[in-house]
Design a protein with these regions (language model features):
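Active-site-adjacent helical/loop segments in soluble small-molecule enzymes
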Residues: 27, 39, 110-175
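Short glycine/serine- and small hydrophobic-enriched flexible loop segments
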Residues: 33, 58-62, 161-168
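Short helix-capping segments at alpha-helix termini
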Residues: 62-68
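Short internal beta-strands
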Residues: 70-76
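Short glycine/serine/threonine-rich phosphate/pyrophosphate-binding segments
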Residues: 46-57, 79-83, 154-163
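Small/polar-residue-rich loop-to-helix segments that shape phosphate-bearing ligand pockets
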Residues: 1-42, 81-127, 133-134
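Active-site nucleophile and cofactor-binding loops and adjacent substrate-binding regions
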Residues: 20, 45-49, 73, 128-129, ...
């Protein structure tokens, strides 16, 4: 026998992914504890199936309520299931090769349980070309103003990638 442990829900399989999402929430609760009473204004969070983004949204909603930060959901342009789902008002499956260097986000389909949260909690959805992930990884490795370097992969750099893209493109700066 074996057990599937995934962060993606599907019909007949919900309990374990919800537990995984609760596990993801530990990181967000640590952020809340370190931030204290004053929340940040924005949080850029990567999304593959959306389970991590949903856990971040839920933790911040519980901690700060109406004062919670604006949640900007970031995904690769080649696998933009969250953006397309938001536009359609329902989950949309992205098909094709899903070729992106942000391999951990190349899912093409939202998790239904995560979408229940993300579709309500997100302030914006951003789909990025891979070049922004490369730029973000470089910025992490070679930070400005004496900040410590961070070793990050492409998927982990997605949030910073969206922030850098927002600085460069006027429509994104309105996030």
């Amino acid at each position: 026998g074996w057990t599937v442990v995934s962060d993606t829900t599907y019909p007949g399989y919900r309990a374990i992914p919800i537990d995984v999402m609760h596990g993801y929430g530990v990181m967000s609760r640590e952020v809340v504890a370190q931030m204290g009473a004053e929340p940040p204004t924005h949080v850029f969070v990567q999304a593959g199936v959306g389970a991590f983004a949903a856990s971040v949204a839920a933790a911040f909603w519980l901690a700060w309520g109406e004062r919670r930060p604006r949640l900007v959901v970031v995904e690769p342009l080649a696998a933009d299931c969250h953006l397309r789902s938001a536009v359609a008002g329902k989950p949309v499956v992205v098909t094709g090769a899903l070729d992106t260097i942000m391999a951990g986000l190349a899912c093409g389909e939202v998790s239904p349980a995560a979408w229940e949260i993300v579709s309500t909690a997100a302030s914006a959805f951003v789909a990025l070309d891979d070049r922004y992930a490369r730029d973000a990884m470089r910025r992490f490795a070679e930070p400005l103003h004496g900040d410590p370097a961070i070793v990050s992969g492409e998927t982990g750099a997605a949030g910073l990638a969206a922030l850098l893209a927002a600085q460069r493109h006027a429509p994104l700066s309105e996030l």
